[in-house]
C-alpha cells in the first residue's frame, strides 16, 4: 500500500522511511518508491 505521512516522514507496516535512509524506502506523495525496501513493505 501507499505510505502514510507522519511528522514529515513516512511509516508503513511499522517501518519508518526517510529519503536519506540508505536501506529504507524513499517516500513521496505517490507512496513508496525506492531501489531498497524496508522488510515487509515491497509488495504492499
From Swiss-Prot:
This is Mu-conotoxin-like Cal 12.1.2f. The modification 6'-bromotryptophan is found at residues 16, 36-37, 43. It is found in: Secreted. The keyword Secreted applies. Keywords: Bromination, Disulfide bond, Hydroxylation, Ion channel impairing toxin, Neurotoxin, Secreted, Toxin. Its main location: secreted. The cysteine framework is XII (C-C-C-C-CC-C-C). Disulfide bonds join 3-15, 10-27, 17-32, 26-38. The keyword Secreted applies. One of its GO terms (molecular function) is ion channel regulator activity. The modification 4-hydroxyproline is found at residues 22, 39. Expressed by the venom duct. One of its GO terms (cellular component) is extracellular region. Mu-conotoxins block voltage-gated sodium channels. This toxin reversibly blocks voltage-gated sodium channel in cephalopods, with no alteration in the voltage dependence of sodium conductance or on the kinetics of inactivation. It comes from the Eukaryota.
Amino acid at each position: 500500500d501507499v505510505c502514510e505521512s507522519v511528522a514529515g516522514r513516512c511509516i508503513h507496516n511499522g517501518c519508518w522511511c526517510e529519503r536519506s535512509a540508505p536501506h529504507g524506502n524513499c517516500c513521496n506523495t505517490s507512496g513508496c518508491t525506492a531501489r531498497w525496501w524496508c522488510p515487509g513493505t515491497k509488495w504492499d
